[in-house]
Regions:
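A structural motif corresponding to the C-terminal end of an alpha-helix
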Residues: 69-73, 153-157, 188-194
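Sec-dependent signal peptide cleavage junction
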Residues: 19-32
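Catalytic-core regions of hydrolytic enzymes
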Residues: 29-146
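Bacterial N-terminal signal peptides that target proteins for export
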Residues: 1-12
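Acidic, glycine-rich loop-and-strand cores that form catalytic or ligand-binding grooves
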Residues: 142-167
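Active-site-adjacent mobile loop/cap segments within catalytic or ligand-binding domains
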Residues: 105, 112-119, 163-198
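Bacterial N-terminal signal peptides
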Residues: 10-22
Length: 198
């Protein structure tokens, strides 16, 4: 079981690396900064199944992804965590802290790595990106492009295509009155005018 996970992790790293590097336009090759966020960590294990903890998988994939991305010219990578910790042990501020860290490094995009839990029959890959609200609209278009590239690479590995998705938050509006994004990491990155994807 663990050796198959290693194979999957290696494939994911190469797929994500190819997707992100494909988005570095020649004019931007002088420098693009990608923030990688290994989901969960510390006291928050995330999903747990078959002796595996999401926080461990997200960290392993993220560290390998960092190494892969740094092999491309013009790509700088920053991490929200590099060990089994959380940027903030306070649950209510943890996601905000992750976005703040990426924004402080002037990241062009924040990629939050997760492995969802679900029924044993659930499988495949999906990518969440900013909705089509007018607020900082460029994060939507860049997020859609990045999500499509990531999803194409992941499904190319043979993972079932669960699609690229957006989700509205019916209880939150952006400052311009447009509908907010549901996921905090995407919403808060957008408020920093930074593309966030999960």
């Amino acid at each position: 079981m663990r050796s198959s996970w290693r194979t999957i992790v290696a494939g994911l790293v190469l797929a994500l690396g190819a997707a992100v590097s494909a988005l570095v336009p020649p004019a931007h090759a002088a420098g693009i900064t990608i923030a990688i966020d290994p989901g969960h960590g510390g006291s928050d294990p995330g999903a747990v199944a078959n002796g595996l903890r999401e926080k461990d998988l997200t960290l392993a994939v993220s560290l390998a992804l960092k190494e892969e991305l740094e092999s491309y010219d013009g790509v700088r990578v920053v991490m929200t965590r590099t060990t089994d910790t959380r940027p903030s042990e306070n649950t209510s501020t943890d996601l905000s802290r992750r976005v703040e860290m990426a924004a402080a490094e002037d990241a062009d995009a924040l990629v939050s790595i997760h492995f969802n839990s679900g029924a044993p029959i659930a499988k495949g890959a999906e990518v969440w990106y900013p909705n089509s609200s007018s607020y900082n609209y460029g994060t939507h278009t860049q997020g859609r492009t990045l999500s499509n590239a990531i999803q194409k690479q992941l499904t190319g590995l043979g993972l079932a295509d669960r699609g690229i998705k957006t989700r509205d938050n019916p209880y939150y509006d952006y400052p311009d009155g447009s509908t907010g994004d549901y996921y905090a990491i995407i919403r808060q990155a957008r408020e920093e005018n930074m593309t966030g994807v999960i």
